[in-house]
Regions:
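Short beta->alpha transition motifs characteristic of CBS
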Residues: 1-5, 87, 184-190
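Solvent-exposed, polar/charged alpha-helical surfaces in well-ordered, non-transmembrane soluble domains
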Residues: 10-14, 18, 25, 29, ...
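Small/polar-residue-rich segments within soluble enzyme cores
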Residues: 11-18, 29-138, 444
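Conserved, well-ordered alpha-helix/loop/beta-strand core segments that scaffold catalytic motifs
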Residues: 38, 127-170
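Short N-terminal helix-loop-first-beta-strand/juxtamembrane motif that initiates sensory/input modules
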Residues: 59-61, 163-177
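Beta-lactam-recognizing serine transpeptidase/beta-lactamase-like catalytic domain environment
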Residues: 118-133, 146, 172-216, 221-448, ...
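Short, gly/Ser/Thr-rich active-site loops of penicillin-recognizing serine hydrolases
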Residues: 366, 462-501
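Glycine- and acidic-residue-enriched helix-capping/strand-helix junction motifs
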Residues: 455-459
């Protein structure tokens, strides 16, 4: 109350300004108009600060208790949970999607009041309840599918990779391959939802809002389309030449010459030329149809704010070179969550799993996309990608387990010239395991690393996959199925014997 404010001395005013983190000149401005009966000196203060202010015993100062969300798990889960605004309404993340469920409903009642006031406050005195119109309803609890252990593990591994390679950012998503539940979804850099006004561009959940050309992670799908139509088989030989192939006046490059290789090795060595030559044999409508079956060009249905569908142009608008480039993941774009969901097909004998972020939501039905036989062939090819002998992602290997996956390395597009940068890349890896009975699917993307420190998907994202999967297999007690199986069994037996002693 500006009219009643009365400082005993200058020191008292100085102490108040200090506690409110205001300059004295700004405090004076707020209190200048003595006709204003209610002046807000500070919107939010901590409870201990309020106590110190009230201990000053300055006449005319009062406070109101305000309940505000506090997020103890901030950085790693900030993009998933989101935050509420000053009005208590959800602004981002699950807070926004489930705001109505979390908030509950206010009640309404009619009271009898008189025109007297109590304790000097401008609040009418209630002398009796007349009628209750609507009872209040408490908000409901929401349980997410997120496993905080894996969320933190993924965040820390991602942070390490981004910092090591001096990249702009990184994102990761981990799915339960059998249920489609999102076990981890994180980005780095992140932000603190308790101070979201300082988040800037990093406030977006880039797993669902940002698109990029997926690159070579599309090769297993385009090759699966050709296998399904019996255009080629896994042993069909493809001449990839000396690492450069001119098609429709454009050069298609491989990182090195691979010569004549079988279809199954096109994925292992990630040959753009091999993928392009295989795609020449399949119609655009069949290739586009297969991509759509895998979920590209539409939202996943995760129901998260800002999710985009990505771009998969109509096949009727593809030129021959567009058809070729789409086979190895250029000329289209997708989100991380789309691609991760797509690879649930390879983990489930050809069925695409619907994904979810909230426990207890209505279960959706899986969709048949590939035959079990073709899926098995592709899964074998994906496992070869992690081979030490010629695979593009040996760094994704997990001790004691057979894992499979595909690397992706794509150039970034200059938003001004619409041309590709020659020194800016996006590196990604989509992996699943264990191969004998896939339990997890995970995709990692590292954006704009320092090229001198390595920019391929296998180098950037492979180690993140390996680190997180090692913990996931351990925490979920997944049986080992790798070549080191006997060694692991022996170690467990030795450990058990020591415990007996």
């Amino acid at each position: 109350d500006a009219a009643r404010i009365n400082f005993k001395n200058k020191e008292q005013k100085k102490q108040l300004a200090h506690l409110l983190k205001l300059r004295i000149v700004d405090l004076d401005k707020k209190l200048k108009n003595k006709k204003r009966r209610a002046v807000r000196l500070k919107k939010y203060i901590a409870p201990d600060t309020k106590i110190k202010i009230m201990e000053l015993k300055i006449e005319g100062i009062s406070s109101n208790k305000v309940y505000k969300r506090f997020y103890p798990e901030n950085g790693p889960v900030a993009h998933v949970v989101g935050f509420t605004g000053s009005d208590g309404k959800g602004q981002e993340g699950i807070e926004r999607v489930m705001n109505k469920t979390l908030a509950g409903e206010k009640g309404r009642k009619i009271n009898l009041i008189d025109n007297k006031y109590t304790d000097g406050k401008r609040t009418p005195r209630v002398i009796g309840q007349f009628q209750s119109i609507k009872l209040p309803k408490d908000g409901e609890d929401i349980k997410l599918t997120i496993d905080l252990r894996l969320q933190n593990e993924a965040y820390n591994a991602l942070k390490k990779a981004v910092e090591k390679h001096e990249a702009l950012s990184g994102s990761a998503v981990l799915l339960d391959a059998k249920t489609g539940e999102v076990l981890a979804m994180t980005n780095y850099p992140s932000f603190n939802p308790n101070g979201y006004n300082k988040a800037g561009d990093f406030i977006r959940n880039r797993v669902v809002t940002d698109v990029f050309e997926p690159g070579s992670t599309m090769k297993p799908i385009s090759i699966a389309a050709s296998l399904e139509k019996n255009i080629v088989n896994k042993n069909t030989l493809i001449d990839t030449g000396k690492g450069a192939y001119k098609y429709e006046g454009k050069l298609i490059h491989d990182t090195k010459a691979h010569g004549v290789i079988a279809v199954k090795d096109v994925i292992k060595v990630s040959s753009n030329i091999g993928s392009a030559k295989i795609s020449e044999k399949i119609s655009s409508i069949n290739l586009a149809t297969m991509y759509k079956k895998f979920g590209y060009g539409k939202k996943t249905g995760i129901n998260f704010p800002g999710e985009v569908s990505g771009i998969l142009r109509k096949h009727t608008k593809w030129r021959k070179i567009d058809h070729s480039r789409v086979s190895y993941g250029y000329g289209m774009n997708s989100t991380l969550i789309q691609s991760a969901q797509a690879y649930t097909v390879f983990a489930n004998k050809g069925e695409l799993k619907p994904i979810s972020l909230i426990k207890g939501k209505d279960e959706k039905i899986s969709k048949r996309v590939l035959s079990p036989k073709i899926t098995k062939d592709i899964l074998t090819m994906l496992e070869s990608v992690t081979d030490n002998d010629g695979g593009t992602a040996p760094k994704a290997r997990v001790y004691g387990y057979r894992v499979a996956g595909k690397t992706g390395t794509s150039w970034k597009i200059n938003p001004i010239t619409k041309e590709y940068f020659k020194d800016k890349y996006i590196g990604s890896f989509i992996g699943l395991g264990p191969v004998s009975n896939p339990k997890f699917v995970m995709e990692i993307m590292i954006d704009d690393p320092l090229a001198d420190k390595g920019y391929s998907g296998g180098t950037l994202a492979g180690p993140v996959f390996s680190k997180v999967m090692t913990k996931a297999f351990e925490w979920y007690s997944v049986d080992a199925d790798g070549l080191e199986l006997e060694e692991i069994k022996n170690k467990k037996e030795v450990y058990a014997d020591k415990r007996k002693l």
